[in-house]
């Protein structure tokens, strides 16, 4: 099994490289790529950690050598948010970066499962889909927006608020990966009883958690470490699924289009990537209203990505 990280010299990428070296199954090949010349050095650095994961690093304009034979590709390349920016401000720079990398994926490893980390995910996943479609290699079972950080944050905040064991706390998060499109289904959390006045503030905290980190870092960075752990968890789940295990994760994929062309919800992962998109289950009145309110934003984000490729 080979996992490639594109954008491996960045704040998320370096932390992700470290976590994958520690967490991927023995015998996995880990391929690190970034345009920055430091990338082979990042690979040497993590290669000194004693685990049975083999690491190679590549830099320069062309990611092809890093992508050859990849089963899983994680894309974290691009610019990060700074204070005062929202994820859509990143669009103009990151859209072109994702397009260029996906064009290489389409040629070099068209059957790989691709996880998009680069923001704005609501839009960059649509860009990736349209590039793969133009190349004639799009398989909607193999393209994912990595929204796992919303799940991690929800699990953490719910466990803190309710005094639950965080390792046993599971919170499905549906919708998209920015602002109002992030919808944690708090009504589905086991062993948590909610007061009406808790739901809305907690939902807003989860939706704005990225900004919480931005402000706390006082202009010195965005949520890189928690994002890296979220991406590592998703990568591990993909690898398990590809190896024949049954794993369920919330992730942003193209489904039946009931809510939007791309939508994050629980997905059963398997040997072909998406094995089954699971139902979102019963919603509270608050969640139902929040879902209806987010859809115009989510659909507009997706359309922006489609138009970027198709004009």
From Swiss-Prot:
Catalytic residue positions: 177 (proton acceptor)
CDD domains the record matches: MDH_glyoxysomal_mitochondrial
GO MF terms held by the record: L-malate dehydrogenase (NAD+) activity
Keyword terms of this UniProt record: NAD, Oxidoreductase, Tricarboxylic acid cycle
Effect of substituting residue 107 to T: In strain: a7205, BR355 and e6181
InterPro entries attached to this UniProt entry: L-lactate/malate_DH (IPR001557), Lactate/malate_DH_C (IPR022383), Lactate/malate_DH_N (IPR001236), Lactate_DH/Glyco_Ohase_4_C (IPR015955), Malate_DH_AS (IPR001252), Malate_DH_type1 (IPR010097), Malate_DH_type1_bac (IPR023958), NAD(P)-bd_dom_sf (IPR036291)
Binding site for substrate: 81, 87, 119, 153
Effect of residue 66 to T: In strain: 1124
Enzyme class: oxidoreductase
Gene3D superfamilies from the UniProt entry: Lactate dehydrogenase/glycoside hydrolase, family 4, C-terminal, NAD(P)-binding Rossmann-like Domain
Effect noted on mutating residue 193 to E: In strain: 176, 667, a7205, b7017, c1271, c6134, c7424 and c8032
Swiss-Prot/TrEMBL GO biological process terms: malate metabolic process; tricarboxylic acid cycle
Reactions that this protein is recorded to catalyse: (S)-malate + NAD(+) = oxaloacetate + NADH + H(+)
Listed EC numbers: 1.1.1.37
HAMAP family in UniProt: Malate_dehydrog_1 (MF_01516)
Subunit architecture: Homodimer.
Cross-referenced NCBIfam families: MDH_euk_gproteo
Family as reported in the entry's similarity comment: Belongs to the LDH/MDH superfamily. MDH type 1 family.
Role, per record: Catalyzes the reversible oxidation of malate to oxaloacetate.
Protein name: Malate dehydrogenase
Organism of derivation: Haemophilus influenzae (strain ATCC 51907 / DSM 11121 / KW20 / Rd)
Lineage: Bacteria, Pseudomonadati, Pseudomonadota, Gammaproteobacteria, Pasteurellales
């Amino acid at each position: 099994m080979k996992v490639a990280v594109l954008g491996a010299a960045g704040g998320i990428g370096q932390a992700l490289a470290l976590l994958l070296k520690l967490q991927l199954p023995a015998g996995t090949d880990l391929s690190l790529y970034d345009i920055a010349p430091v990338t082979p050095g990042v690979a040497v650095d993590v290669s000194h950690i004693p685990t049975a994961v083999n690491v190679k690093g590549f830099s320069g304009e062309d990611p092809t050598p890093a992508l050859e034979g990849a089963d899983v590709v994680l894309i974290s390349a691009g610019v990060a948010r700074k204070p005062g920016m929202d994820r859509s401000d990143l669009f103009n720079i990151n859209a072109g970066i994702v397009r260029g990398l996906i064009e290489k994926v389409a040629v070099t490893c068209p059957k790989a499962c691709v996880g998009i980390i680069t923001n704005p995910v609501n839009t960059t996943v649509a860009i990736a889909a349209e590039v793969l479609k133009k190349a004639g290699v799009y398989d909607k079972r193999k393209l994912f927006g990595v929204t796992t950080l919303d799940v991690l944050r929800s699990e953490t905040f719910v466990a803190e608020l309710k005094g639950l064991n965080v390792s046993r706390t599971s919170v499905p998060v549906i919708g998209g990966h920015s602002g109002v499109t992030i919808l944690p289904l708090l009504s589905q959390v086991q062993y948590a009883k909610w007061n009406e006045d808790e739901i809305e503030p907690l939902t807003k905290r989860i939706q704005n958690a990225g900004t919480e980190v931005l402000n706390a870092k006082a202009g010195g960075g965005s949520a890189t470490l928690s994002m890296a752990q979220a991406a590592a968890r998703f990568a591990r789940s993909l690898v398990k699924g590809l190896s024949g295990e049954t794993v369920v994760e919330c992730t942003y994929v193209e489904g039946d289009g009931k809510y939007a062309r791309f939508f994050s919800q629980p997905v059963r992962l398997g040997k072909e990537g998406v094995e089954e998109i699971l139902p979102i289950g019963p919603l509270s009145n608050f969640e139902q209203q929040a879902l209806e309110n987010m859809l115009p934003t989510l659909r507009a984000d997706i359309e922006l990505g489609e138009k970027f490729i198709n004009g």
